[in-house]
């Protein structure tokens, strides 16, 4: 038997309750975008997901149900910043944009840079290779519009 002398890989920090809520909301939105099931059915399915009990339940509910309820308005808010029709977005990109747009509009207690970073992380974790760059660019432009004062103060 040989001993492994390689340096120990640092453990990733534990996910925050809000990050778990965002991940679960993205998964729920993905399901909803694909089959338009009743939001209650989508949510019930997610209750069995690993980590659901560690998620910020209130934030999850707000993101999932709020993004579904306001899907048309949220999509309309970021559509001017797209370089292609909404129908051509991957479901993961679209779900990440919905989560980010919802937080930018409704969760003003969360700094816009945090909102964008979290949406980018969702796209990196669940999306295609370059999708996160697209999500970043679209949400950055949306933030400049819906949180103009905050963005101007930070730049």
From Swiss-Prot:
Species of provenance: Ralstonia nicotianae (strain ATCC BAA-1114 / GMI1000) (Ralstonia solanacearum)
Question: What NCBIfam families does this protein map onto?
Answer: nusB
- Provide this UniProt record's keywords sorted from A to Z: RNA-binding, Transcription, Transcription antitermination, Transcription regulation
Functional description taken from the UniProt entry: Involved in transcription antitermination. Required for transcription of ribosomal RNA (rRNA) genes. Binds specifically to the boxA antiterminator sequence of the ribosomal RNA (rrn) operons.
Q: Name one GO molecular function term.
A: RNA binding
What name does UniProt use for this protein? Transcription antitermination protein NusB
Quick one: which gene encodes this? nusB
Q: Which InterPro entries match?
A: NusB-like_sf, NusB_fam, NusB_RsmB_TIM44
Family matches, as Pfam families: NusB
- The reply on keyword Translocase is no
